[in-house]
């Protein structure tokens, strides 16, 4: 009886983690970690500016418009243009040029970290995160999920929602597919937050230069991509 239950449990767990060995999912894991690192690095090193999304930036732009802060408004608009430009570029390269963008993404992320580590602390923080805004946006256009799941690697709101929905549905109905969904998004959340933690630690230890630590997970992703 015990052996039979053990076999059933092992089979369920194997099905639950059946995506864990795919190269796409491994890359997704690493880039989720990197996405958390990039976000935290920008926040910790540049006055709390989150480079990986536009909701806060555009809301702040409306505040600048209301207050008549013209220069700050231009910086915010520039931030949005840089972010949007990376999305346009990733779309053109993917759809019209037929390029596999993964290796391009690694290079752009690495270049952004190098540039950010060289920019002076006195530079306007919004302008200073432009390189990371471009890199994060390009990463979003490149790594948008794996194994049939749509999942961002640069921010986690939708990942949190899908994780909660997946486990809620599983608890309610016992649907194995819902459990797999919850596990997938749950692991993505954990890795993103682990990367964010490393980002804060890196800045705490090395200041702006701490961003170079983010090259380590990029190297791991490059290894998986080339093997």
Annotate each language-model stretch with its function:
Residues 2-227:
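Alpha-helical transmembrane segments of multi-pass membrane proteins
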């Amino acid at each position: 009886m015990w052996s039979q239950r053990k076999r059933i449990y092992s089979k369920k767990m194997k099905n639950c983690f059946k995506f864990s060995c795919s190269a796409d999912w491994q890359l997704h894991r690493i880039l989720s970690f990197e996405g958390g690192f990039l976000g935290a690095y920008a926040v910790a090193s540049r006055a709390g500016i989150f480079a990986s999304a536009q909701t806060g930036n555009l809301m702040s732009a409306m505040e600048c418009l209301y207050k008549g802060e013209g220069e700050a408004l231009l910086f915010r608009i520039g931030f949005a243009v840089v972010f949007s430009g990376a999305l346009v570029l990733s779309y053109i390269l993917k759809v019209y040029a037929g390029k596999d963008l993964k290796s391009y993404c690694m290079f752009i992320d690495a270049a952004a970290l190098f540039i950010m580590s060289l920019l002076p602390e006195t530079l306007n923080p919004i302008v200073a995160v432009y390189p990371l805004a471009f890199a994060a946006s390009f990463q979003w256009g490149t790594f948008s999920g794996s194994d049939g799941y749509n999942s961002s690697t640069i921010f986690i709101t939708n990942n949190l929602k899908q994780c909660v929905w997946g486990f809620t549905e599983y608890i309610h109905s016992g649907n194995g597919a819902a459990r797999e969904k919850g596990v997938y998004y749950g692991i993505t959340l954990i890795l993103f937050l682990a990367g964010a933690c490393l980002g804060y630690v890196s800045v705490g230890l090395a200041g702006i230069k701490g961003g170079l630590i983010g090259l380590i997970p990029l190297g791991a992703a490059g290894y998986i991509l080339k093997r």
